[in-house]
């Protein structure tokens, strides 16, 4: 399996941001790490191995990036306003730096699929829902899609525009909403076992239903924990469905 790493100083984030790409061809998959982890987390925990068949057969080219969660939502020393400012800067980093790199390698019209587990599911879903004109869809695993609990009741525009549970409820425009209503690749999946919060996925699904946005909500069994062994089953399962479309 081809594996390429690169890094550059992000003008949006003010720090070096490494990236790893797996594969020689295929549909681009942008991967957001869990919690405060780094761009190699999915390799260390064998999630990349779980989708190796798709990569080696030229169906998927996977791009894994760093998160900024340790500077934003998970930084208990930071003011909530700074936490969400970092999320907005991260969004600009994706759109202005990562997406052009992917399109340079996969074609100028490429619309990547996003994915992530746990806190990575929030980032993957948020990126897609904010930019459905530039991304194809999302496979969000074991996520929670309301950031308000991290912010000590703080509120500003950055909170609103980085919180899918907020902005999707009020989406009523003639640009983004029609595109989302044509979606064919939104997957919201979670287990119902230890440390999972299936009600968070159901909440997001209810919002999407209220807006007429097609999606797949799947609640795996009560034995399915918030853990790697299950994400290694979920991602190849839904990538298989995506590649058959």
What kind of feature is each model-predicted range?
Residues 1-245:
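Non-catalytic cap/lid and distal C-terminal segments of serine-dependent acyl enzymes
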